[in-house]
Amino acid sequence: MSSLLAFHAHPDDESVSTGVTLAKYADEGNRVVVATATDGSAGEIHNYDNPEELFPKLAEMRRKELEASLEALGVKEYEWMGFKYSGMMGTSENDDPDCFWRQNYFDPVGKLVDIIRKYKPDALITYDPFGGYGHPDHIQTHRIGTAAFFAASDLDKFPLKDSQEVWIPKRLYYSAWSKKRMQSRRQQMFDAGIISEEEFNRFNPIGSEHDDIDVEVDGTKYVEHKIKSMKAHRSQFKDDWWGFNIPDEFKEDFLGYENYILAFNRGSWSSETDLI
């Protein structure tokens, strides 16, 4: 049995960025673990009539949503790191000294090192240096995840605790969106009248160059798992969101493939379709 650890910024990122990947490897009998850095406590609230009353409980709500999401994906183990949500780039939340964006590296890296030593993953997934789309928490997750990948074997800075053992993950992956694939998908959806011009342009031209992608996981078998997982994050996705109503002829192509950049490889591993 192989093991995979996905380190994400917010509750719901595990679904959006890696949903079919996690479902696939869990279903195939591998140990799959999700570590979520922040509590999502400053996110939007959809589908509720009283969002102002719910904001004080948002972190608790989002943790429960995460648990339901992971159940939909078949993931049985997770770690809630509980750092404070940092808000979008350029907002006042970025200046909060308690937010994840403002944390010194040592504390969050140390927490993730403990998680790596606990679960002993063969591969670690996090984000690229831009964090996918420039969110402060995603950028910080990239930094912390990359640092912890190497720090897990650094006994000088991170001595072993209790019954811990040194663990060195074999591979580090950055979750990525192929710019070429995203543009093609959006164009198809726009031409079919499924998404608006605003949605079409929303993330354009975010993504990685297609030639930089090392692995494309085919999770078409698990598309419905991913949709159910995203729907579990009810406070974050409107019930009528177009992503829940993709016609069958587009659904597998749009949601069933997830891309990764192999950032570091200890050994001779080479695959264009498999992470572990």
Question: Each PLM stretch: what is its role?
Answer:
Residues 1-5, 93-98, 102-276:
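Metal-dependent de-N-acetylase/amidase catalytic core
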